[in-house]
Amino acid sequence: MGKNVVVLGTQWGDEGKGKIVDLLTEHAAAVVRYQGGHNAGHTLVIDGEKTVLHLIPSGVLREGVQCLIGNGVVVAPDALMREIVKLEEKGVPVRERLRISPSCPLILSYHVALDQAREKARGEQKIGTTGRGIGPAYEDKVARRGLRIGDLFHRERFAAKLGELLDYHNFVLVNYYKEPAIDFQKTLDECMEYAELLKPMMLDVTAELHQLRRAGKDIMFEGAQGSLLDIDHGTYPYVTSSNTTAGGIATGSGVGPMYLDYILGITKAYTTRVGSGPFPTELFDDIGAFLAKRGHEFGATTGRARRCGWFDAVILRRAIDVNSISGLCLTKLDVLDGLETINICVGYKNQDGAVIDAPTDADSYIGLEPVYEQMPGWSESTLGAKTLEELPAAAQAYIKRIEELVGAPIDIISTGPDRNETIVLRHPFA
């Protein structure tokens, strides 16, 4: 029998999911994206060559792996085609390997215009979105007025729906935000061009996944962003617009929870966050700058500098519960090399002095102070280590303490950006 393995982020995104998905797809027949859009940025390094993916699943660089985009993903046709062409220029036969659900909501120019106009209007109170139209596209979906990829192949029906949508959204853009209107004919013509390009890649992804499952094939489910950015379970309102936690798999792919065999939670050996929102362990000192520089902490999608802080066991415990995590993958351990002491956040202290667990909304984080447990660092290099025994004793103790604090095993340790710089203690597909 095949196994269905999930890879998802347990922090605020940017945990290193792309590398791990790429590593594990050696065993998979298919990789499926089930939520988010091209706001994701998954970086792969193979033999020193770097590839950044936004919409296309991270298995695309492996021959014989089918890459699927499930119905829960919002698709910007222009961004998708740019990504396809860029990979094809490197010799990757993307159109042979990629199939897309016609039920995916479309991100069009008016979604991008709305997203950017809102962030501009919020000023200092902005959420910190990527400005790529993700939120407005999900809003249209939930309001049951959105256009889907499948609509592209019925020109008259598409044109009628597009006209109604532009009447609605242009009214807001022009009258409320004082921004220019989106042109109907230009948008329609562009969409019809994309229709021709996308049609050969259409597939009932849900049916395909169940066919693969019944045939005993291994399937990888690739999450985007991180658990603390989940629309329901994250630090609301500083969240994304989809369910980044395990619940999003069933709704975004059509594969129910009973069929999921192993859920791998990816966590950095420290913590980062992009954009606005609470971050209890954030560092504003030289160590924060050290982590950012050593870890190359700049967003793969936006290029924005990431905020850096100590490892937070509190948010990880919440993520483990919410996702039913089977095991963890600890990434970027090598970034901590050379630090004399390392702190782990074990709780939050409120203004009354009581130690509490993770709050459920952003406002409740105000006034909380992290409670730290200090551990010795290590001077030796962990970069490229392939076995646990190669790691310094202090690094092994750090890993063991994290396991104790969060109540989940660390099954994989990443010791560098390349797919081969990895220690696998328990393989998810085993």
From Swiss-Prot:
MF GO annotations: adenylosuccinate synthase activity; GTP binding; magnesium ion binding
Recorded superkingdom: Bacteria
Catalytic-site annotation from UniProt: 14, 42
Keyword DNA repair: no
Gene Ontology biological process terms in this record: 'de novo' AMP biosynthetic process; IMP metabolic process
Residues binding GTP, per UniProt: 13-19, 41-43, 306, 332-334, 414-416
Gene3D superfamilies named among the record's database cross-references: Adenylosuccinate Synthetase, subunit A, domain 1, Adenylosuccinate Synthetase, subunit A, domain 2, Adenylosuccinate Synthetase, subunit A, domain 3
InterPro entries assigned: Adenylosuccin_syn_GTP-bd, Adenylosuccin_syn_Lys_AS, Adenylosuccinate_synth_dom1, Adenylosuccinate_synth_dom2, Adenylosuccinate_synth_dom3, Adenylosuccinate_synthetase, P-loop_NTPase
Positions bound to substrate: 300-306
Cofactor(s) recorded in Swiss-Prot or TrEMBL: Mg(2+)
Family assignment from sequence similarity: Belongs to the adenylosuccinate synthetase family.
UniProt cross-references to HAMAP family, sorted A to Z: Adenylosucc_synth
General function of this protein: Plays an important role in the de novo pathway of purine nucleotide biosynthesis. Catalyzes the first committed step in the biosynthesis of AMP from IMP.
Name recorded for this polypeptide: Adenylosuccinate synthetase
